[in-house]
């Protein structure tokens, strides 16, 4: 079984990547540098599973830079889904966010939340149109001992 982890150097992706390696899985990680096109990072080989964590992660940053965040989150996810469809990936596991839920009414309150919701919808669309198996996980208050506590949107 071959596994690809996007955003494998990020907060949650790095933990999963390390655990999969430790457990002996055939895993490869990619990380997108600022402004880099994901197509240049994606390997020209097939994988069974893709865990997609690559994103511009901060709500506060998205409020100040909505179009940049849109490109980094929505366009990257769209490109990855198309790549997965063309490389016979069995399942894409998409890392979404509690920011999609807004204040509990399902209406995002930030560009970051909106972009994650759009990406969830695109995952569903790829499942319906192309038969690509996708799963979206919404994380609430992810925390570890090495987490930073800064920012006005910190909740844990």
Predicted features and spans:
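ATP-dependent carboxylate-amine ligase catalytic core
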Residues: 149
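Short, intrinsically disordered, charge-balanced linker/junction segments flanking boundaries
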Residues: 25, 152-156
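N-terminal Rossmann-like NAD(P)+-binding domain of SDR-like oxidoreductases, especially those catalyzing
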Residues: 1-145
């Amino acid at each position: 079984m071959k596994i690809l982890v996007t955003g494998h150097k990020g907060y949650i992706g790095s933990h999963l990547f390390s655990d999969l390696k430790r457990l002996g899985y055939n895993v490869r990680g990619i990380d997108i540098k600022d402004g880099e096109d994901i197509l240049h990072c994606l390997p020209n080989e097939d994988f069974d599973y893709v865990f997609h964590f690559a994103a511009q992660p901060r709500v506060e940053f998205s409020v100040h830079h909505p179009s940049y965040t849109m490109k980094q989150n929505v366009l990257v996810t769209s490109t990855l889904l198309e790549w997965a469809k063309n490389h016979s990936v069995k399942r894409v596991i998409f890392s979404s966010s509690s920011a999609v839920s807004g204040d509990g009414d399902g209406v995002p309150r930030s560009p970051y939340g909106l972009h994650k919701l759009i990406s969830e919808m695109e995952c569903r669309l790829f499942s319906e149109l192309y038969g690509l198996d996708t799963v979206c996980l919404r994380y609430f208050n992810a925390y570890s001992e090495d987490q930073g506590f800064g920012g006005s949107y910190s909740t844990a």
